[in-house]
Amino acid sequence: MADFDNLFDEAMSRADGAIRGVMGTEAKVMSGTLSGATLVGVFDDPENIGYAGAGIRVEGTSPTLFVKTSTVSQLQRMDTLTINGRQFWVDRVGPDDCGSCHIWLGNGTPPASSRRR
């Protein structure tokens, strides 16, 4: 287990591990450096209730995968994943927080342009 600055961070890391263990879903990496690897994380696909104009990102409407940070250190933008038989692509990997992070996903195949949408 990693060294933590305080007991709270250590407790949060343990809680996150328990949550991933109980609620975790397998995500198969289909492309990139981690191709063939299986990640375990909590998958959240919120209902998309509206659309913003071009070039506007609305936080909270993209699917996410909550994972252990050390397992995704080589995951890159545009890598593809299969979760529950559906294809997704990596939009971005969030910062580490007590050993865990969120991966924001796009639905389907990655866009032709690598420019962030």
Curated annotation (Swiss-Prot):
Q: Which domain of life is it from?
A: Viruses
Single Gene Ontology BP annotation: virion assembly
Presence of keyword Lyase: no
Under the heading SUPFAM superfamilies, the entry gives:
Phage tail proteins
Q: Where in the cell is it found?
A: Virion; Host cytoplasm
Q: Which UniProt keywords apply?
A: Capsid protein, Host cytoplasm, Late protein, Viral capsid assembly, Viral release from host cell, Virion
Which InterPro entries does UniProt cross-reference here?
A: Phage_Head-Tail_Connect_sf, Phage_tail_attach_FII
Entry GO CC: host cell cytoplasm; viral capsid
Partners and quaternary state? May bind Head completion protein and Tail shaft cap.
Query: What is the role of this chain?
Result: Plays a role in virion assembly by joining the head and the tail at the last step of morphogenesis. Six Head-tail joining protein bind the DNA-filled capsid after binding to the Head completion protein, in turn binding the pre-assembled tail.
Question: What's this protein's name?
Answer: Head-tail joining protein
**Gene name as annotated:** gene 10
